[in-house]
A protein has these predicted regions:
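Short beta-strand-to-loop capping motifs
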Residues: 9, 54-60, 95-98
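Amphipathic, positively biased hydrophobic alpha-helical segments used for protein targeting
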Residues: 17-19, 53, 128
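Short histidine/acidic/glycine/proline-rich micro-motifs that form metal-
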Residues: 12, 55, 125-127
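N-terminal beta1-alpha1 ligand-phosphate binding loop
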Residues: 1-27, 32-39
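Flexible, gly/pro- and Lys/Arg-enriched active-site loops
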Residues: 31-33, 41-50, 63-67, 71-161
Length: 161
């Protein structure tokens, strides 16, 4: 099963926390975006995030993949205090090829992916032909507010950080 994961962190050693996800999926990564510095989304009175997108081929079911991401978040001691608040690690399933779900535990595609520069810009960098709900990710990036696009800063590939 091919899945698109958006990963992010804005607490502690952000690079090392993202690296744990890269390491966990090392043998299953088909493509990876550079790491980007991004402003917080939703709740803006918090530190800047580091974000990246991984495209992975995995054997597990969507729910098993969700649990795998949650285990990584738990290992990073993520505490869910405030919706869209600071976090040590966030592992979101953005899309799964050939799969949709409106289960409140796992919405696929991710219900906010189409409006989040911190998801779309890294995803486009990882896969120039990416599509979300039938529309090209490049088109969705072009439709973002130019100010929002400008706030996303490429830092480099994970192995360079």
């Amino acid at each position: 099963m091919r899945a698109v994961l958006s990963i992010g962190s804005n607490m502690d050693d952000r690079v090392e926390l993202l690296r744990t996800v890269f390491d966990e999926f090392a043998g299953e990564i088909v493509a990876a975006s550079p790491v980007y510095a991004t402003p917080p989304w939703g709740v803006t009175d918090q530190d800047e995030f580091l974000n990246a997108v991984l495209i992975v081929d995995v054997e597990e079911t969507p729910k098993e993949l969700l649990r795998r991401g949650q285990k990584l978040e738990e290992a990073a001691e993520r505490v869910r205090v405030r919706h869209w608040g600071p976090r040590t690690l966030d592992v979101d399933i953005v899309d799964i090829e050939g799969y949709t779900s409106d289960d409140p535990e796992l919405f696929v595609p991710h219900p906010y992916a189409h409006e989040r520069a911190f998801v779309l810009i890294p995803w486009l960098a990882a896969d120039a032909g990416a599509r979300l709900s039938g529309e090209g990710v490049a088109k969705r990036v072009a439709a973002l507010d130019p100010k929002e696009r400008a706030e996303i800063r490429r830092l480099g590939m994970m192995e360079e950080l």
